[in-house]
C-alpha cells in the first residue's frame, strides 16, 4: 500500500503537524506500507529531516510552493500521482478547506482517468482535524481531542471517523509505560514544542531555579531522542499545549500547561476539563503570563 502524507512545518505553524504524522508514518511502515511525505517547500523538508533525525529516512516530494496556497498545489499533486498513484493521502494542514477536499478528489480522478485512458478511482483521502472549522469531504477523519467523541454528528461526510484520545498518534516509545509515584519535585521538564516565539524556555528556567534539576525540550537546546525515558524521570512539567500533553499523560507526569496559539488554547482547556492537566492560561495575554510566572 502506498500512502502520502501532506503536511508542513515552519516558524508560523510550528512542527506539530509533521511530528504527529511522523508517528503515524512509523507505524504504517512497520505494517508494510510505503510512505511518502509531500511538502510545500524546502523549509518543510528541513523540518522533517530535523525531526526524523535522519535526512534520508523518508521519501519526500517538495511541491515548490509557499505555505498557505492549497489551491495552487492541486495540479501539482495530480501530476505527482500520475507517476506514483497512492492508495491514500493523509492531509494534516490548517490551510485547507472543505472545498479543497472536493476539488482535490475531482482533480485526482480526472487526471488519473485521462492518463490511463479508463475510469480509475482517485486515492482515498484522510484528514487530521483539531480545528472543527468544516466537515471534510474525506474517507477518514481523525480528531483525538479529549471531547472529540461528541463530534460524531459533526463529521457527516466522512465514511470513517476515529474520534477521541485513544487515537492520539503517540510514538512507539510511549507504549506500555509504567509511571512512578512522585513524592516530591526534584526535576522539572520545560517544553515549548517545535517553536518558541516568545522565548518561554529561558523565562521559565529562571522561574524554577529553586528546583535541583531542569530538563528542556525547545528550539536551541540539545535534541532529545529518548523522550519517554526523559519524561519518566521528571516529577513535574510545564508545557505548551501540543501533543506533548498526551505524552506527559502517558508518562504520568503532573503538568502545568500554557498556550501560545489559538488551537493550543482550545486543546489546553479541553485537557484541563478532562482533569489531565492544570491550565495556566495563554501567554499572549498579560493575565496568562502573570499567572504562569506566579
Predicted regions mapped to residue ranges:
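A nucleotide-sugar donor-handling region in carbohydrate enzymes
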Residues: 136-198
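Acidic donor-binding loop of glycosyltransferase active sites
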Residues: 232-243
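Catalytic binding pocket for nucleotide-activated donors in carbohydrate/polymer assembly enzymes
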Residues: 245, 249-292
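Active-site and donor-binding regions of nucleotide-sugar-utilizing enzymes
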Residues: 6-15, 20-33, 38-51, 57-156, ...
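Short acidic alpha-helix that forms the nucleotide-activated donor recognition element
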Residues: 224-234, 249-250
Amino acid at each position: 500500500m502506498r500512502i502520502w502524507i501532506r503536511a508542513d512545518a515552519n516558524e508560523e505553524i510550528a512542527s506539530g503537524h509533521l511530528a504527529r504524522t511522523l508517528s503515524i508514518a512509523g507505524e504504517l511502515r512497520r505494517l508494510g506500507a510505503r510512505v511518502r511525505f509531500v511538502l510545500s517547500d524546502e523549509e518543510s523538508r528541513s523540518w522533517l529531516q530535523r525531526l526524523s533525525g535522519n535526512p534520508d529516512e523518508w521519501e519526500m516530494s517538495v511541491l515548490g510552493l509557499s505555505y498557505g496556497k492549497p489551491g495552487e498545489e492541486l495540479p501539482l499533486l495530480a501530476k505527482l500521482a500520475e507517476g506514483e498513484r497512492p492508495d491514500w493521502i493523509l492531509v494534516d494542514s490548517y490551510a485547507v478547506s472543505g472545498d479543497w477536499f472536493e476539488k482535490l478528489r475531482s482533480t485526482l480522478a480526472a487526471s488519473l482517468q485521462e492518463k490511463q485512458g479508463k475510469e480509475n478511482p482517485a486515492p482515498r483521502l484522510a484528514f487530521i482535524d483539531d480545528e472543527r472549522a468544516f466537515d471534510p469531504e474525506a474517507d477518514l477523519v481523525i480528531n483525538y481531542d479529549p471531547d472529540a467523541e461528541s463530534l460524531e454528528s459533526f463529521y457527516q461526510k466522512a465514511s470513517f471517523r476515529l474520534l477521541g484520545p485513544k487515537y492520539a498518534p503517540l510514538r512507539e516509545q510511549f507504549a506500555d509505560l509504567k509511571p512512578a509515584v512522585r513524592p516530591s519535585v526534584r526535576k522539572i521538564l520545560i517544553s515549548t514544542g517545535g517553536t518558541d516565539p516568545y522565548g518561554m524556555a529561558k523565562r521559565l528556567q529562571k522561574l524554577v531555579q529553586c528546583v535541583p534539576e531542569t530538563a528542556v525540550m525547545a528550539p536551541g537546546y540539545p535534541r532529545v531522542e529518548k523522550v519517554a525515558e526523559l519524561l519518566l524521570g521528571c516529577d513535574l512539567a510545564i508545557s505548551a499545549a501540543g501533543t506533548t500533553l498526551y505524552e506527559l499523560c502517558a508518562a504520568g507526569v503532573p503538568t502545568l500547561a500554557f498556550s501560545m496559539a489559538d488551537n493550543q488554547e482550545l486543546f489546553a482547556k479541553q485537557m484541563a476539563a478532562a482533569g489531565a492537566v492544570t491550565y495556566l492560561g495563554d501567554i499572549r495575554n498579560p493575565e496568562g503570563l502573570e499567572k504562569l510566572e506566579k
